[in-house]
Swiss-Prot record:
Gene3D superfamilies: 3.40.50.2020. Its cofactor is Mg(2+). GO terms for biological process: UMP salvage; uracil salvage. It comes from Pseudoalteromonas atlantica (strain T6c / ATCC BAA-1087). Allosterically activated by GTP. This is Uracil phosphoribosyltransferase. SUPFAM superfamilies: PRTase-like. Belongs to the UPRTase family. Catalyzes the conversion of uracil and 5-phospho-alpha-D-ribose 1-diphosphate (PRPP) to UMP and diphosphate. It catalyses: UMP + diphosphate = 5-phospho-alpha-D-ribose 1-diphosphate + uracil. The keyword Glycosyltransferase applies. Pfam families: UPRTase (PF14681). GO terms for molecular function: GTP binding; magnesium ion binding; uracil phosphoribosyltransferase activity. Its EC number is 2.4.2.9.
Amino acid sequence: MSVKEINHPLVQHKLGLMREAGISSKNFRELASEVGNLLTYEATRELETETVEINGWNDQPIKVKKIKGKKITIVPILRAGLGMLDGVMQLIPNAKVSVVGLYRDEETLQPVAYFDKVVKDVEERTALIVDPMLATGGTLIATIDLLKEKGCQHIMGLFLVAAPEGIEAVVSKHPDVDIYTAAVDDKLNEHGYILPGLGDAGDKIFGTR
């Protein structure tokens, strides 16, 4: 597993704007999409390509590179992950979208899937999980478990911010999954919020609590 903190100036500038108190839902949502787009560019850097022959503009055969295989399925985790979906799809508009929703069981405190709409051939694709925040890691681990149960072998995660505790939890359970984030923040507080973090990303994206 590799954890890649994307320190590109545009990523860091936009993330800084998102951290400001009083940011509007509109601005937060737009920035989440933009940072998601930039993270996607970095995360797809290592995708395998193959050389194919096509007819060029003058109807002459030429060789070009294309992404190999069935390519990608984007997996936004409800609800906040939807805020990054548009930005990701701007770069890979033909990707299939698999949606996963989870809630936390009050007795076991474990994530339980309440919605699962995963593309049928997920075992042939790279799954790109998108969620604004990686906090405790429980939701991500449950999503990875679900995808692997369906046969998916190549999984990556995109996050605006991540907590060291969550990264450690995911590494211990799924060392083969790569994580891309705009920032590895300091820690979780006693309520499970990332510090300095972004607050509640879902509330800010959708304007509702």
